[in-house]
């Protein structure tokens, strides 16, 4: 008797598969590269804006050689008068090796000026980055003569550089109030003092940015578009079953992102901070793929010349398709260390407890722990190279959705000096899931690649609104290829306002 054949849709089987799609890390948690980029951009922009306030006060590396007048060098005799003048001029012209040598000879002579010695030692300590020691020397100097204006100004500068913002503000304000408006020299000094006071005010101002613009994406549903037909034999007959995933969904919409940050100095290096990140997309005629993320963080902050620490509670809220997807309370900490004038290291860590809003996703409830390490290296001609590693441990009630993720990031940035800058960075992450899935008959593992290119054009800014172009490519390769592997492209053109 011939066997009966028929084609049967896999509609019933796709019901659990549609639930499994929610275990995609892209839907489980906020875009890691985006949140990292926005967090790291906050510090960079704050430093750039501060340098703009102080552009006329930054050290000049083109100072003339010591005691060179009209191209002729003059020798310095071994006496208090000539050595004292040489010490002062070498400090003024930032000739630190000369200054150290002349100061050693000067202080070896009996009757040397203790005020000049303290002033020079303070300047040398500051040049070497020993700001606490420099502060001690300048305070010794002012203990000898409290109204010595150069000493007061240098102490205020050291407090500023060492991030003792409250004390520095008081010092500059006292200098400003003591200057005579009718004195031409005081007017020049007053401009310097005002620049530092503006920079100090800016440190405690609300700082942020907001960008919005059109976006196009070609695979909103992260579909592999796979189709496979196989034969299943049963006691009732033999069936041809087609297993197919939907076509990739493309759409236009709006892409947006914003940051808001504030730090308040309390005393010395200590303060408190508040920070918010907002980013997401909203699509025309495909609102079920809309996604938005809000991350708030506040707590304790410590700043000095070489280190920044921040630690405190965080709250994250995510929506998909205009409906709440999850909320997550947690803790976040970071450490920024300036290794040198051209090299910086940042270590970030966060822990959050994710609670999904719908019972259908409650099996995904669980905690996420992440650590990110990033190193920046400034290169000649305004190039910057950066890279890092990250580790994420995701737990959930459903062990088949829990995973350990290891990542590597690498990027390069270039300021072209013509009002245009560009950033290109890539990330590679490998996920190993915790448990075997009986539904999928496999233990899931994935490799994910992401590439992002950002082009900004400040020279085209209108009313300080800067256009930027962002191009992204994302590729996921899964051992469960037919369900979880996909490619995704997006391009957006945003207008950004900083404040």
Predicted regions and their residues:
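Bacterial N-terminal signal peptides that target proteins for export
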Residues: 3-15
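N-terminal signal peptide c-region/cleavage motif recognized by signal peptidases
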Residues: 23-24
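Gram-negative and organellar
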Residues: 30-71, 88-92, 100, 119-127, ...
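A structural motif in tetratricopeptide-repeat
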Residues: 76, 110-111, 145, 179
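Alpha-helical segment of the N-proximal tetratricopeptide repeat
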Residues: 78-109, 120
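Start-of-helix register in tetratricopeptide repeats
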Residues: 81, 115-116, 150
């Amino acid at each position: 008797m011939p066997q009966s054949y028929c084609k049967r849709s896999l509609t019933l089987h796709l019901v659990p598969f549609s639930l499994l799609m929610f275990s995609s890390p892209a839907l489980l948690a906020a875009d890691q590269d985006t949140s990292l980029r926005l967090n790291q951009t906050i510090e960079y922009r704050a430093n750039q804006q501060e340098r703009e306030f102080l552009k006329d006060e930054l050290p000049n590396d083109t100072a003339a050689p010591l005691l060179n007048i009209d191209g002729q060098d003059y020798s310095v005799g071994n006496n208090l008068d000539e050595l004292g003048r040489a010490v002062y001029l070498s400090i003024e012209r930032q000739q630190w090796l000369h200054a150290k040598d002349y100061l050693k000879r000067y202080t070896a002579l009996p009757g040397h000026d203790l005020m000049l010695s303290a002033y020079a030692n303070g300047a040398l300590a500051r040049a070497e980055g020993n700001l606490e020691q420099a502060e001690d020397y300048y305070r010794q100097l002012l203990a000898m003569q409290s109204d010595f204006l150069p000493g007061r100004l240098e102490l205020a500068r050291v407090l500023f550089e060492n991030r003792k913002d409250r004390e520095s503000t008081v010092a500059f304000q006292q200098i400003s109030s003591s200057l005579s408006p009718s004195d031409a020299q005081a007017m020049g000094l007053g401009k310097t003092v005002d620049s530092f006071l503006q920079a100090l005010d800016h440190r405690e101002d609300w700082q942020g940015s907001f960008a919005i613009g059109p976006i196009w994406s070609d695979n909103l549903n992260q579909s592999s578009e796979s189709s496979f037909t196989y034969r299943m034999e049963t006691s009732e007959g033999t069936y041809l079953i087609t297993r197919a995933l939907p076509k990739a969904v493309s759409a236009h919409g709006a892409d947006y992102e914003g940051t808001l940050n504030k730090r308040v100095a309390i005393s010395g290096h200590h303060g408190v901070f508040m920070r918010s990140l907002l980013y997401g997309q909203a699509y025309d005629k495909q609102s079920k793929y809309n996604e938005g993320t809000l991350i708030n963080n506040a707590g304790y902050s410590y700043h000095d010349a070489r280190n920044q620490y921040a630690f405190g509670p965080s709250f994250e809220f995510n929506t998909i398709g205009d409906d709440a997807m999850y909320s997550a309370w947690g803790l976040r900490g970071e450490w920024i260390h300036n290794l040198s004038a051209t090299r910086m290291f940042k270590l970030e860590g966060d822990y959050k407890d994710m609670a999904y809003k719908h019972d259908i996703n409650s099996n995904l409830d669980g905690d996420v722990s992440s650590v990110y390490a990033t190193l920046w290296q400034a290169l000649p001609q305004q190039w910057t190279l950066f890279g890092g590693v990250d580790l994420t441990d995701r737990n959930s009630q459903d062990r088949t959705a829990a995973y350990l993720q290891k990542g590597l990031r690498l990027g390069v940035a270039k300021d072209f000096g013509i009002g245009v800058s560009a950033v290109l960075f890539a990330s590679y992450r490998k996920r190993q899931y915790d448990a075997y899935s009986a539904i999928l008959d496999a233990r899931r593992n994935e490799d994910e690649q992401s590439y992002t290119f950002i082009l900004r054009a400040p020279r085209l800014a209108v009313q300080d609104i800067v256009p930027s172009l962002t191009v992204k490519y994302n590729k996921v390769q899964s051992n469960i290829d037919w369900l979880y592997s996909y490619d995704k492209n997006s391009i957006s053109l945003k207008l950004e306002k900083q404040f």
